[in-house]
Amino acid sequence: MTLDLAHYPLLALADTPEQLRELPQDKLKQVAKELRQYLLTSVSQSSGHFASGLGTVELTVALHYVYNTPFDRLIWDVGHQAYPHKILTGRRDRMPTIRQKNGLHPFPWPNESEYDTFAVGHSSTSISAAVGMAVAAEKEALGRKVVAVIGDGAMTAGMAFEALNHGGDIDKDMLVILNDNEMSISENVGALNSHLARLLTGNFFNSIRDGGKKLLSSVPPIKEFASRAEEHIKGMVVPGTIFEELGFNYIGPIDGHDVNGVVDTLKNMRNIKGAQILHVVTKKGKGYELAEKDPIKFHAVPKFNPSADGLPKAAPSDPTFSNIFGRWLCDMAQQDPNLMAVTPAMREGSGMVEFSQKFPAQYFDVAIAEQHAVTFAAGLAKEGQNAVVAIYSTFLQRAYDQLIHDVALQNLPVLFAIDRAGLVGADGPTHQGAFDIPFLRCIPNMVIMTPADENECRQMLYTGHKLNKPAAVRYPRGSGTGVKPDNTMQALEIGKSRTIRQGEKVAILNFGVLLPYAEKAAEVLNATVIDMRFVKPLDTEAVANVAKNHELLITLEDGATTGGAGGAVAEYLLSTVHTSRLLQIGLPDEFIMQGTQTEMYAEIGMDDAGIIAKAHTFLAQ
């Protein structure tokens, strides 16, 4: 699919930032208009992240117009809002392939484009990277500028403030753009603030300020008075005290959809030395009424008709594992008033909307603060509350010390409901849930469960909730296998597996939701199939039994094989006298790119065909 550029005459002239900078400034408003329409049309025909990019169109145009990218470094936080950036940096015609196998990466990716200066996908990393690049730029002494763009949501994370604290302290030349698209920091936007922003960034104001500081540096009382006067003038309309205290010169807020106003402000700010923050207010979903009204719903979209009155209704399907978790959470809360559910800003994705509405006193969204989420849950558990942390596998990585030091070390009964375990599909390598089993398995006191279907997931959540120690239940993105969960809940016997099929010579030890692949492969291989259920404690009795009676053991898991569940089986076999051969099948020692789960499991050789082929090859050796 290629869009007809005849409908985008100015955008057609700006395939790269170099071409964009050749246009007169009075054409930028039209460029932004065409860019927004191009984004709307392309994403509606291909799917992808949507509302965030609509809100950053003018800002993106202004940044590439003012700064000499890619020589000047532009770092996008997370990357949801970077679709306009991709369109303006030579990837316009490939936008229909975004998030698809062998297509454009879903987030900024340096291997894809020199304009993507830093790989991102998780939030709140941009300022830290920018501080490092600013130090390097000063050392190079080539006049390189460094700009980080971060949203107000990402600014809630501790890492962002750690970077601000350091960046303000060393005061290197850098600009942080706070893209405030939720009005959560300030609504104080208007002509006066836009005028003030241009005034405060202009040469006249800054020459007076810098010159005055030098002149009065030997007269401390007068210098202090002048500083207070400046702060008073700015403070009347500028809500930037916290940033000023951290050592950044704060400008704004300004209207992020006034492309010429943003350009003028950025041109002025290029000439200011030291650490700067520009507060830009934008509207998520800007220019598409439905997305403006419901930016959460339109954050990421399937293919849709822009002329329709909403997104297409999803075809009937089995409940997702997130749905299973959400239903269990509500059912459990009806029985347990001490259940406390915690999420780091992933209410919708984790299936917690209904719970948050029905049990608001037991629901805690701590914002993008994974470290705090885990230790907060530890505090709840220490005082007798039954804490449940709902978190994506890839984001649990960010709270590893808290997992060990604050939960496991004290053997606190915190249940981790780990969503998006295994391959997540279109979001690619930054979001694959590959590493949770390896990094959890080495932690003392931790119980790790891998449900094979919806009912096991529900029963394991109940088991972990009733267990008086740390526990984790990991489950994938998307729909289950069609197994209807039992309404009743029953605790499983810890560390015990179940036999699915009895065969000969080959035994498949399955951990998790790849069980249907294992069963199909077993029909061809005449293999025994064991649903292992628990990675830790491992059912060593079951492993020992199949090792006695089978020539080949195959471990199958939707996570990294290095240190994974297969590794646990290998370690046990090495510690005994069993001589069975072992084939570990799982995610290889590499970062897996984007594509559908089905596509990627087939490519890696983790589907039934791959299992059969690997087994035959292994047996032939």
UniProtKB/Swiss-Prot annotation:
Its EC number is 2.2.1.7. Binds 1 Mg(2+) ion per subunit. Binds 1 thiamine pyrophosphate per subunit. It is an enzyme of class 2 (transferase). GO terms for molecular function: 1-deoxy-D-xylulose-5-phosphate synthase activity; magnesium ion binding; thiamine pyrophosphate binding. Keywords: Isoprene biosynthesis, Magnesium, Metal-binding, Thiamine biosynthesis, Thiamine pyrophosphate, Transferase. It catalyses: D-glyceraldehyde 3-phosphate + pyruvate + H(+) = 1-deoxy-D-xylulose 5-phosphate + CO2. One of its GO terms (cellular component) is cytosol. Mg(2+) binds at residues 152, 181. Belongs to the transketolase family. DXPS subfamily. This is 1-deoxy-D-xylulose-5-phosphate synthase.
